Amino acid sequence: MRVHDQRLRFDVTPKPMGLNGSSLITARSVALLLFLSLLLLILPPFLPPLPPPPATLLLLPLLLMILLIFLAFSPSNEPSLAVEPLDP
């Protein structure tokens, strides 16, 4: 059984963005956003009003924010990565 040396090749040349479907903003995504925007403008007058959410549900975003702030300022258990020169 032979093992072949396979190397990955990466193409790093910049390519122009076109309307061929590979760009981030396509005609389909723009049409979808316009459709959803129109629905948000048209539907509220026809739908019945919703009751207010329970008080505990209103505390959920506050609790999530407190948790995220705590995690942002807590020290990590990973050792710090130091960059060392390659010269011996």
Swiss-Prot record:
Chief localization: membrane
Compartments (UniProt record): Membrane; Endoplasmic reticulum; Nucleus; Cytoplasm
Spans annotated as Organ Size Related (OSR) domain: 25-76
Entry's induction text: Induced by ethylene but repressed by abscisic acid (ABA) and epi-brassinolide (epi-BL) treatments.
InterPro entries noted in UniProt: ARGOS/ARL/OSR1 (IPR037468)
Family to which the UniProt record says this protein belongs: Belongs to the plant organ size related (OSR) protein family.
Domain remark in the UniProt entry: The OSR domain is sufficient to promote organ growth.
Described purpose of this protein according to its UniProt entry: Together with ARGOS and ARL, regulates organ growth and final organ size. Promotes both cell expansion and proliferation-dependent organ growth, in an ANT-dependent manner.
Protein's recorded name: Protein ORGAN SIZE RELATED 1
Origin organism lineage: Eukaryota, Viridiplantae, Streptophyta, Embryophyta, Tracheophyta
